[in-house]
Amino acid sequence: MLVGLTLALGAPARAEPLKVVSDNPPVQPGYSRFVLHSDRIGRDFTVTVNTPGAIAFLPGQKLPAIYALDSGYGLAGPQGVVLSNTGAMEPAIIVSVGYLPGQALFRNTDLLHNKVTDHGATYGGGGAAFEAFLLEDLKPFIEAKFPADPARSVLFGHSFGGLFAANVFADKPDAFYGYIIGSASAWADPALIARVAAAAPKAHGQRVYLTVGEKEGAGKPGGGSTMTDGYNGLLKALKGQPGVILKAQIYKSETHLSYYPRLVTDGFPHVLPPGAPLGAYQARLPDATMAKYVGDYRLPDGRPFSITTDKEGGLYGHVAGFPPIGLLQNGPDRFFTPTVDANITFDATGATLAGVDGGTMRAEREKAKP
């Protein structure tokens, strides 16, 4: 539904270098899953897209997108939707990038920019190609199919994924609006911390969430630096940089992977904090005043738009084919929604003026049937 709506609203055409091997029908609202073939890398990837409950219905509305590596461990997408829909963070599209069954070990190639030899095995070296896949192939693909804001994307990685995210920051801090770097395996790339330190002064307001588990301080099997060493080195490289909005967290009593759900819960709101509408004053209006807004409207493109009320007097906006959006009043004839940066104003004629991200659209009230 969202794909069709975006295309109907005139999303700009983009080249799509990725071949869709399969596009599974959604199993629930706000969920899409693709298997995409990358000619650049020569392999297929699974890409799962979760969209928040409050879906855009005005031309030009864009949402941030969080790109979660390792398929977000199956948690990032659903957790992100809950956080988006409850006002804990700015609503965002969650894009989880992973592998087909039996191919998860390709992460050892894709997530390491340099080769590493560990316990007699040599792997890695595919990070630059995977970085190009994300930035030049996957992001344009997602932005053509979903209302994702190209300037407000976030990269989220843990372990080797955290190492990859730190390497992307080191290459070009402005590649993403924000970075979530969890338990980065900096031991696998000894030059990483120095590169991050050199890149940090070039950042322009990047929001970074840096974490490690308290119990990750034990030495690596066979010796070498620890995850905690990597965390401390990255913290020193990023702390105090004027262009980096940094939050760092050591999760007490947690191991390498056990804190991952908390990493999502805490990290997403840092990189995408809830917007101003959440702090708007909610005025209380008489029931008779509320009732005058209820009715059927028509958008300029012909789509029906209705406003209804529930038993508690709350107002809801409905666009055909999409979930209802709750409306909270913040003054006479003015409403906002906490899950989208949007507002609705009723004028003297009873028509509505809906605004999203500075754009407006007028919806005329339908005449009552005789």
Predicted regions: what they are:
Residues 211, 217, 228-232, 239-282:
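C-terminal catalytic histidine-bearing segment of alpha/beta-hydrolase fold enzymes
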Residues 99-101, 180-188, 213-216:
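Active-site nucleophile loop of the alpha/beta-hydrolase fold
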Residues 62-133, 137, 141, 145:
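Serine-hydrolase catalytic machinery in alpha/beta-hydrolase-like enzymes
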Residues 15-63:
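A domain-start/cap signature at the N-terminus of enzymes
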Residues 147-158, 179:
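Alpha/beta-hydrolase fold nucleophile elbow
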